[in-house]
């Protein structure tokens, strides 16, 4: 018996990242991690910066970095509208490390008119990119 699947579309402002059938999707929603399977209840939520992992119809897994966006789930279709979506191959690891270091330094040296929220968002984005790269390098998904 074939595994049940659902249509997944992941698009960013620049292009379509993925269009196909999946048996599972994992993303970071506004309230925490979400695991979506076929026939999931309808849902609309914000996506936080982080890793998205999905299992394709052939059983292979793919991991992406999402900088944020919206997730719409219907029983037969899932749509991810990402601000930025990158495959691990497209992530500049050196730039992500530099962004992480800049954000950590900015937080450590915060002044009175420091934008803490912007610095923590930048830190979260760089850490999420590095996590995707690390997962691919180690060939793991958690």
Curated annotation (Swiss-Prot):
GO terms for molecular function: ATP binding; proton-transporting ATP synthase activity, rotational mechanism. Keywords: ATP synthesis, Cell inner membrane, Cell membrane, CF(1), Hydrogen ion transport, Ion transport, Membrane, Transport. Disulfide bonds: none annotated. One of its GO terms (cellular component) is plasma membrane. Belongs to the ATPase epsilon chain family. Produces ATP from ADP in the presence of a proton gradient across the membrane. F-type ATPases have 2 components, CF(1) - the catalytic core - and CF(0) - the membrane proton channel. CF(1) has five subunits: alpha(3), beta(3), gamma(1), delta(1), epsilon(1). CF(0) has three main subunits: a, b and c. This is ATP synthase epsilon chain. It comes from Shewanella frigidimarina (strain NCIMB 400). The gene is atpC.
């Amino acid at each position: 018996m074939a595994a049940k699947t659902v249509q997944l579309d992941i698009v960013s402002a620049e292009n379509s990242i993925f269009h196909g059938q999946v048996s599972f999707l994992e993303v970071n929603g506004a309230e925490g991690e979400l695991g979506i399977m076929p026939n999931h209840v309808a849902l609309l939520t914000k996506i936080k910066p982080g890793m998205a992992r999905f299992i394709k119809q052939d059983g292979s897994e793919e991991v992406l970095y999402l900088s944020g966006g919206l997730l719409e789930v219907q029983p037969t279709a899932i749509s991810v509208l990402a601000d930025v979506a990158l495959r691990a191959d497209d992530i500049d690891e050196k730039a992500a490390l530099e962004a992480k270091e800049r954000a950590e330094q900015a937080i450590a040296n915060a002044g009175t008119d420091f934008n803490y929220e912007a610095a923590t968002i930048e830190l979260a984005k760089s850490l999420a990119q590095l996590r995707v790269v690390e997962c691919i390098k180690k060939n793991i998904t958690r």
